[in-house]
Amino acid sequence: MINLRKTHPLLKIINHAFIDLPTPSNISAWWNFGSLLGMCLMIQILTGLFLAMHYTSDTMTAFSSVAHICRDVNYGWLLRNLHANGASMFFMCLFLHVGRGIYYGSYLYKETWNIGVILLLTVMATAFVGYVLPWGQMSFWGATVITNLLSAIPYIGSTLAEWIWGGFAVDKATLTRFFAFHFILPFIITALAMVHLLFLHETGSNNPTGINPNADKIPFHPYYTIKDALGLTFLFLVLLLLALFSPDMLGDPDNFSPANPLNTPPHIKPEWYFLFAYAILRSIPNKLGGVLALLASIMILLILPLLHTANQRSMMFRPISQTLFWILTADLITLTWIGGQPVEQPFIIIGQLASMLYLLLILVLMPLAGLLENYMMKPKW
């Protein structure tokens, strides 16, 4: 009898993607994050769906509807804690996934990489509109500050900001449309993730050495299904520890107060996963300049394939590039810390230096290191 998974029109697609897929035999745990991100997305969609059944997107009742979910709905507190901390896990996996791509030169699969950057931007947009929904102080002021950045665009800025708000300030219309965006975007993310996977399977996975792995491939199942299962176990463990023992550790205390347009919080700051970009935005004392730097901090990922000068794909055998990569990692952690600090010295100057270093590393130092390593690896006889 012919195997059904190889002939059935639907099962055939699943088979080619997750069962009989030829996979390099040497991919490390750094290749687990794709499946972890898929699982994060599923958790977020499921918990979000059940939360949406009880949430009301109206300025008068949004805050109390979230309180009602936590107090009166069966396991509502758990759903909310899993959803809020699930977002943090999602971004943790995203950053590690992107970092892996930079370290091992995965960005040379241009289509896969570009779709990945679009995915990153879409997830960031989803998280931003989602953070506004509980209608706490930080939700309201975060929405006000970030949407206000649109007004920095020359000529059409003010009109654009008011169009997004649906009025002259962040209000009921804004909350309603943000809820609509937050509901639809995860399904767009799912579709994009499928396209991401489609492009990846056109070329096959990269591997730590960066050389062509065709000579030594193994089937995805059972080898990598079991490996992914182990990764998922760790993900669930960390998520449950967060959600059950310290659910508010990564949140902002200001968000326990209902939104009040007449009272500005002393320090307006977004969730931890946006702090690096927020620090870059704040480090430029000009509004439009800050917005452009904010965009550049993410969009710079799109030009990484053009900045690749090394003869080798991976950084595995390139110690100078490795050193610069880890300096970049430390720099991003520094920016994340600065983004959460008040706008005063010495934080201002540290933020400006870290922002400069971020752009300098990616645009100048890493391409130069690639050229230097090419020269050093040339035979000298």
Curated annotation (Swiss-Prot):
It comes from the Eukaryota. Its cofactor is heme b. SUPFAM superfamilies: a domain/subunit of cytochrome bc1 complex (Ubiquinol-cytochrome c reductase), Transmembrane di-heme cytochromes. Binds 2 heme b groups non-covalently. Heme b b562 binds at H83, H182. GO terms for biological process: mitochondrial electron transport, ubiquinol to cytochrome c. Heme b b566 binds at H97, H196. A ubiquinone binds at H201. It is found in: Mitochondrion inner membrane. GO terms for molecular function: metal ion binding; ubiquinol-cytochrome-c reductase activity. PROSITE patterns: CYTB_CTER, CYTB_NTER. Disulfide bonds: none annotated. It is a multi-pass membrane protein. Its main location: mitochondrion. InterPro entries: Cyt_b/b6_C, Cyt_b/b6_C_sf, Cyt_b/b6_N, Cytb/b6-like_sf, Cytochrome_b, Cytochrome_b_C_euk/bac, Cytochrome_b_N_euk/bac, Di-haem_cyt_TM. The chain crosses the membrane at residues 33-53, 77-98, 113-133, 178-198, 226-246, 288-308, 320-340, 347-367. Keywords: Electron transport, Heme, Iron, Membrane, Metal-binding, Mitochondrion, Mitochondrion inner membrane, Respiratory chain, Transmembrane, Transmembrane helix, Transport, Ubiquinone. One of its GO terms (cellular component) is respiratory chain complex III. The cytochrome bc1 complex contains 11 subunits: 3 respiratory subunits (MT-CYB, CYC1 and UQCRFS1), 2 core proteins (UQCRC1 and UQCRC2) and 6 low-molecular weight proteins (UQCRH/QCR6, UQCRB/QCR7, UQCRQ/QCR8, UQCR10/QCR9, UQCR11/QCR10 and a cleavage product of UQCRFS1). This cytochrome bc1 complex then forms a dimer. Component of the ubiquinol-cytochrome c reductase complex (complex III or cytochrome b-c1 complex) that is part of the mitochondrial respiratory chain. The b-c1 complex mediates electron transfer from ubiquinol to cytochrome c. Contributes to the generation of a proton gradient across the mitochondrial membrane that is then used for ATP synthesis. Heme 1 (or BL or b562) is low-potential and absorbs at about 562 nm, and heme 2 (or BH or b566) is high-potential and absorbs at about 566 nm. Belongs to the cytochrome b family. This is Cytochrome b. It comes from Myoictis melas (Three-striped dasyure).
